[in-house]
Amino acid sequence: MSRSLYKSTLDFLISQSSIKAEGNHLRRLKTLCGMLCSCIKTQKSTLEGISSATDQSNSESALKQAKRWLDSKWSDWESFFAPYIIGLVQKAMSKGEIILVIDGSEMGGNCVTLMLSFIWGNYAIPLAWITREGKKGHFPEQMHLDLLKQVHHLFASPQRVILLGDGEFDGSKLRAWCNSNAWEFVLRTSKDHLVDYGDEIAPLSKLSPVQGHQFAFLEDATKGDHAIIWQGKGHSDPIFLLTNMDLGAMACRYYRKRFKIENLFKSMKSAGFNLHKSKVEGAARVGSLILVVALAFVLTICVGFLLKKQPKQVLKSFVRVDKVPKMSPILLAQKCLDKTFDLALSFFLNLSKNWATFFS
């Protein structure tokens, strides 16, 4: 691995660290830096992959350090991820609102992760996560709440916070928590969800749009929250939603953004960093591995955004220019890394040196 990539990334990690970079914390930052650079360059999430391109001359020593870092109780979100994502979160909130999307996905060996992302432009960015052992299935509602509470302090009033989620996240406790914290939400629910029609309690499926309209809106349908049946264009079946927004059309418009988290999972796995091929096991270790991959994702997508703004003569050195408008920033940056590494390196160096102003 180029020493310049390692050094510039380490300088970035040190400059943005919320803890003074000395002693054990500096040592942990150096190990993280090696794993992060390896993940970016090799696009792999295996233990061997994230330790194969570090500045260590002894690959066996690098592998042991990577294992220790992933297992360490000190390798936490507060110290090694939050300080580096806060600038992007603030940028996303610059227009007075932030959109959060929550969903689960299988990651690592025999583990499933509950992921909270935020929307920046047309892309979902990883924000926080909880990992547990087991195959994909619903998380307990308390875990949903634990994840939201973990990031609550990042969003100061009067920013508008909007939470989107599928049918797993329609629980009454989660909705009550959102209401008590002035968060708005649009959450999918089942057609069998019982709601109050005023004169009777009946399944939501009883509601139907007036002919010529795409949705029907039922006010105060359940514990003060509203219900929507949405038969949008391209929907083979109607979508049933719960929301505390007062306008049905607005709720449907926001809910469309929920599906962006699917592209995030795809980028972290098969179309990006191959997290699905990692054989790392154990909830704590997989959670730490996701931290490395999430940081690699953030840096790579930011470089991709920079590349999107470059003139054609720069882009044509590594990609067909006519393909760029529809290409994801992650893929664009990775193509640049694969075909013109020195060019990609120059953008990573620029990003690491100007991280604070990148979001201004």
Residue ranges and their predicted role:
Residues M1-K44, F81-A82, M93-I98, G109, ...:
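Single, function-defining residue in the core of a domain
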Residues I40, T54-Q56, E60-G109, G165-D166, ...:
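Active-site- or DNA-interface-adjacent structural scaffold in DNA-acting proteins
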Residues T42-S52:
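Short, charged amphipathic recognition helices of the HTH superfamily
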Residues L70, F118-W120:
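Residue-level signal for short segments within beta-strands and strand-turn junctions
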Residues C33, L47-E48, L63:
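Short amphipathic alpha-helical segments
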Residues N110-L116:
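Short glycine-rich loop/turn motifs
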Residues A53, W69, S267, A271:
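Short acidic/histidine-centered micro-motifs embedded in hydrophobic/aromatic stretches
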